Amino acid sequence: MFLPHMNHLTLEQTFFSQVLPKTVKLFDDMMYELTSQARGLSSQNLEIQTTLRNILQTMVQLLGALTGCVQHICATQESIILENIQSLPSSVLHIIKSTFVHCKNSESVYSGCLHLVSDLLQALFKEAYSLQKQLMELLDMVCMDPLVDDNDDILNMVIVIHSLLDICSVISSMDHAFHANTWKFIIKQSLKHQSIIKSQLKHKDIITSLCEDILFSFHSCLQLAEQMTQSDAQDNADYRLFQKTLKLCRFFANSLLHYAKEFLPFLSDSCCTLHQLYLQIHSKFPPSLYATRISKAHQEEIAGAFLVTLDPLISQLLTFQPFMQVVLDSKLDLPCELQFPQCLLLVVVMDKLPSQPKEVQTLWCTDSQVSETTTRISLLKAVFYSFEQCSGELSLPVHLQGLKSKGKAEVAVTLYQHVCVHLCTFITSFHPSLFAELDAALLNAVLSANMITSLLAMDAWCFLARYGTAELCAHHVTIVAHLIKSCPGECYQLINLSILLKRLFFFMAPPHQLEFIQKFSPKEAENLPLWQHISFQALPPELREQTVHEVTTVGTAECRKWLSRSRTLGELESLNTVLSALLAVCNSAGEALDTGKQTAIIEVVSQLWAFLNIKQVADQPYVQQTFSLLLPLLGFFIQTLDPKLILQAVTLQTSLLKLELPDYVRLAMLDFVSSLGKLFIPEAIQDRILPNLSCMFALLLADRSWLLEQHTLEAFTQFAEGTNHEEIVPQCLSSEETKNKVVSFLEKTGFVDETEAAKVERVKQEKGIFWEPFANVTVEEAKRSSLQPYAKRARQEFPWEEEYRSALHTIAGALEATESLLQKGPAPAWLSMEMEALQERMDKLKRYIHTLG
């Protein structure tokens, strides 16, 4: 092709600007004609076939002519300024894109007659390929002076880059190498002219396209790995394609890494896309429940070649506040498959933060009100919240790569271990100015309604107690003790705090334990709510003996006080606290509990047992709690109990088991029954106790509660191994189902045969079902509820609520007045009958409420 020898600007003004727009129109018209006529193409219709082939041939020639124009510009010695040839790149890119789109859609355009024109379509594609390659060579020669602010030149370069970006989306599935080279050119030109075009580039479009291509190539890689895993024979062609695709993954990831590094300040609106990229990749990769099943070798290959590039990307984004906001958004609502990757991401952030400046750590580790509608929670709160969502991964459990230690092989660890180890490591590097945030986050998590989250926080807190100073541990124990004393009644937060107190107490230095004893003296009954939660094994021998003596003395005295008074139900709550403290003594005092103290406890327990009857235990929650505390106390002293008392206990429990009682009551019965395995029952009462024992075990083994079932199997095994009355063991197995259940337990085989894949699918379904009710609850709402240990559930307003409260307040006042009168003098004969009548009315109301519920 011949072009006159003139400078670029003159060529643009006299030729390109005049001819190229007409060329584009001509090409578009030919493309329209092709698409319209292609419907009638057939091997019989030679006229249409000839027409289409002529059009395609003309297009090939036109592309060749354009290539000649581009080559002419490249061949000149003149420096290339984009504004001087602005018609050429835009026209050429339009034609190239149109060509590639047509080639991509050729199967649907030409339907079953593609073979009639396939040779020309291939030629057309090759010409477009050559034209783009030549154009990129030309564009690489373009000079843009960073000191000259030429808006037209800047705009032209931005248009060129985004036009190439559009072409990328077309050719991504057509030619991987060409696709990668086009991306390489886009990144290169963006960085080359960065200082001039950085404010004009549509960074979000570039990042989004890159992330889409990363995900597409990654999914292709996984599909190939899955096919090779499922296939018995190793196909070298498949493996080469896998390696090629993996290489493409790495290229795209490195391109993203490079681009993000240079243009980070402009990526505010791309942070959500980058966050989703990380989550989507890890959701499809083992050990995610939603991962593609691939071999260990392929996992390691993908991780080593591709996943490693995500780590420096997170390092780059760590200091970028918009990324923090996306990751720690209080309203972040992720689907089930992305919750586990979010947890992994937060752990990665924890690992990287210690190397960051204090200012960055502070931003990540503190709450922030970003706007009226947007709140950023702290990293630690986010870790606990995210961890709580991984119920399926925790229950399987999934395993992750463990930490390497000197002289030991690396072992896989559970998600719980993974998070716990990294959390504790993070705590060691926590900046002192952020300790208040650490304390608040740990306490908030300990008070969580989710048991495993609370346990994780306790483990981290115990690590802090050991890692920190003795004074810090003592301070924390004192705070927890005050929190426990401030709880007005039973709630899950109180249970969590009591477990934490028991564990932390072991880490206290003896001098601080002595201070604790002085501050919360066991000589005072008001402190027994604390001592019921403390293991006396945590104390050194001298302090243990002292506190055991004091708790036992005060506890038995309080029991006698209750026995000597009116013995009202209202006083049972404090009595139950006393019994719980005495039980703690029995369970952990060891040799410090001498014979005299044992006798004193047995005496009051026997007297208290005498006041129990079936109706009270069946109907009254406080009596049920008393009953469930007396049973383990009786079991502890089973060898020294009066046989008549044992008979009474067994008879009462046999009757109660036929009623609907809470699980904790039946578990207490179970503990007592299993303790009878240590006892030789006197012949005089064997005929009355042994049948009841077999009946109790039969009823408990048939229970459908999984928790009770497990404990019953353990208790029955313990009883059967220790009892001298082997003859009743077969009598406990009342059905074939029960026998099979016990045999499976003894042989440690599951009740249900389940493949690993089926187990994963079941856990995924369960996770979706269990999480659904909480999907719309924000972190802020969870935080508010968990910081209030008094409330068992969020308050819900009902019609007439205030009237109900007023009526109950009146009832409570009347009961208090009656109690006061009883303390002043004897009750009239009619009072007992009237109270029975009131009790019946109360029971009727309770039944009515249950039917409404």
Curated annotation (Swiss-Prot):
The keyword Metal-binding does not apply. The modification N6-acetyllysine is found at residue 792. One of its GO terms (molecular function) is protein kinase binding. Changing residue 43 to D: Increased binding to PLK1. It is found in: Chromosome, Centromere, Kinetochore; Nucleus; Chromosome, Centromere; Midbody. Phosphorylation at Ser-43 by PLK1 strengthens FIRRM-PLK1 interaction. Phosphorylation at Ser-744 by PLK1 negatively regulates its interaction with PPP1CC. The modification Phosphoserine is found at residues 43, 744. GO terms for biological process: chromosome segregation; interstrand cross-link repair; mitotic cell cycle; regulation of protein kinase activity. Keywords: Acetylation, Centromere, Chromosome, Cytoplasm, Cytoskeleton, Kinetochore, Nucleus, Phosphoprotein. It comes from the Eukaryota. One of its GO terms (cellular component) is nucleoplasm. Interacts (via its N-terminal region) with PLK1; controls PLK1 kinase activity. Interacts (via the KVVXF motif) with PPP1CC; controls PLK1 kinase activity. Interacts with FIGNL1; may regulate homologous recombination. PANTHER family: CHROMOSOME 1 OPEN READING FRAME 112, FIGNL1-INTERACTING REGULATOR OF RECOMBINATION AND MITOSIS. Regulates PLK1 kinase activity at kinetochores and promotes faithful chromosome segregation in prometaphase by bridging kinase and phosphatase activities. Phosphorylation of FIRRM by PLK1 negatively regulates its interaction with the phosphatase, PPP1CC, thus creating a negative feedback loop for maintaining proper PLK1 kinase activity during mitosis. In complex with FIGL1 may regulate homologous recombination. This is FIGNL1-interacting regulator of recombination and mitosis. The gene is FIRRM.
